[in-house]
């Protein structure tokens, strides 16, 4: 009994003197492990006379419980001290000056797109949206694109294996809108479009805005008036404009719109800014609208083109290179 008591006292002193978790773990193994001294005492109970076993067993169990509690308490003390030391080393000096948050800004293409949408909203046009992954019907067939049209070629259009494609224009939204609404109607579709083309003035992905008006009395004069008002409102000045005959499968007659753009040297040159025309009767028929009763006009423009003109950017690719030095100019 005195041997167990003496062993317990020495062990408790060693536990209290342990300075690291590793030292404490070594003591636990030496005392309570499979080959530990307390465990050895338990194994020797069978060699004692029967009348001594009960008292010796109780003493050994009390010793084991006391050591287990002491080990747990010392472990908690060491862990708390280590945490306090780490927190003291990581203490934040609240008197140091803070870092100001960087102020963000809208991308110039986003600014331009919102400006275009806002102008047409004032003219009574409703904004509509549609999928960027289209089917052949909405992207080509319903818009009077014949099967042999060059726009269907692989070098102009990104096709998927199942026959679907990345939309080459937002005109498919017009088809969906006419399917869901009855004339008279005014709408614009804005979003990303995709074509296999990349150079200083073209990108394989760009943003487009297309507009559509259908009613019983619309004519080309209405179209010219609408686009003249839009150009004046967007650039906040008057331009001399001309409408050149051009071919688009979904309009007849079709035209491209040029504005007299002043160069840095003071000279003026004609600059193409958008395409337009009267909606082709076949397009109206494809969505169940009677072309004998209704007429309409449509127009489309590249958002990046207008952003380049508004901000004086010469290379379209600068909009997509994510150079903060470039983008910060427009924030």
From Swiss-Prot:
Q: Does the keyword Cytoplasm apply?
A: yes
Q: Which GO terms describe its cellular component?
A: cytoplasm
Task: Please state what class of enzyme this protein is.
Answer: ligase
Q: What is its EC number?
A: 6.1.1.20
Main location per UniProt?
A: cytoplasm
Task: Tell me one GO molecular function of this protein.
Answer: phenylalanine-tRNA ligase activity
Catalysed reaction, written as an equation? tRNA(Phe) + L-phenylalanine + ATP = L-phenylalanyl-tRNA(Phe) + AMP + diphosphate + H(+)
One of the protein's GO biological processes: phenylalanyl-tRNA aminoacylation
> How does the record describe its quaternary structure?
Tetramer of two alpha and two beta subunits.
Which HAMAP family did the record assign?
Answer: Phe_tRNA_synth_alpha1
Q: How is this protein named in the record?
A: Phenylalanine--tRNA ligase alpha subunit
Q: Which organism is it from?
A: Xanthomonas euvesicatoria pv. vesicatoria (strain 85-10) (Xanthomonas campestris pv. vesicatoria)
């Amino acid at each position: 009994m005195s041997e167990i008591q003496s062993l317990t006292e020495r062990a408790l002193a060693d536990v209290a003197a342990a300075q690291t978790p590793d030292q404490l773990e070594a003591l636990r193994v030496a005392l309570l492990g499979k080959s530990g001294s307390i465990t050895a005492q338990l194994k020797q109970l069978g060699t004692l006379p029967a009348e001594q076993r009960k008292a010796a067993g109780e003493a050994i169990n009390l010793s084991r419980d006391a050591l287990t509690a002491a080990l747990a308490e010392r472990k908690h003390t060491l862990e708390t001290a280590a945490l306090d030391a780490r927190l003291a080393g990581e203490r934040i000096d609240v008197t140091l000056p803070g870092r100001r948050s960087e102020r963000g800004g809208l991308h110039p293409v986003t600014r331009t797109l919102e400006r275009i949408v806002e102008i047409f909203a004032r003219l009574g046009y409703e904004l509509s949206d549609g999928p960027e992954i289209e089917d052949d019907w909405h992207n080509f067939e319903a818009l009077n694109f014949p099967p042999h049209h060059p726009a269907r070629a692989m070098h102009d259009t990104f096709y998927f294996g199942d026959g679907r494609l990345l939309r080459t224009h937002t005109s498919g939204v017009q088809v969906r809108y006419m399917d869901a609404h009855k004339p008279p109607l005014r709408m614009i579709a804005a979003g990303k479009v995709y074509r296999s083309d990349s150079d200083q003035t073209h990108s394989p992905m760009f943003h487009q805005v297309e507009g559509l008006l259908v009613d019983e009395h619309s004519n080309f004069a209405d179209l010219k008036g609408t686009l003249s008002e839009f150009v004046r409102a967007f650039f906040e000045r008057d331009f001399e404009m001309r409408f050149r005959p051009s071919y688009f499968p979904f309009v007849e007659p079709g035209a491209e719109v040029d504005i007299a753009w002043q160069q840095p040297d003071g000279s003026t040159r004609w600059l193409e800014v958008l395409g337009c025309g009267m909606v082709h009767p076949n397009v109206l028929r494809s969505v169940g609208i009677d072309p004998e009763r209704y007429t309409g006009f449509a127009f489309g423009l590249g958002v990046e083109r207008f952003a380049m003109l508004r901000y004086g950017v010469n290379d379209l690719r600068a909009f997509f290179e994510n150079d903060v030095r470039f983008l910060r100019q427009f924030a």
